[in-house]
Amino acid sequence: WNPFKELERAGQRVRDAIISAGPAVATVAQATALAK
């Protein structure tokens, strides 16, 4: 078991989540701005 390997894998998962969530967050922010 390698803590650094695990950390790296977790970091990649977080980065993937941010990348996939980015457009959704932008869309929500835009919708909120339009709704005001």
Swiss-Prot record:
It comes from the Eukaryota. Its main location: secreted. The keyword Manganese does not apply. GO terms for cellular component: extracellular region. One of its GO terms (biological process) is defense response to Gram-positive bacterium. It is found in: Secreted. Cecropins have lytic and antibacterial activity against several Gram-positive and Gram-negative bacteria. This is Cecropin-D. It comes from Antheraea pernyi (Chinese oak silk moth).
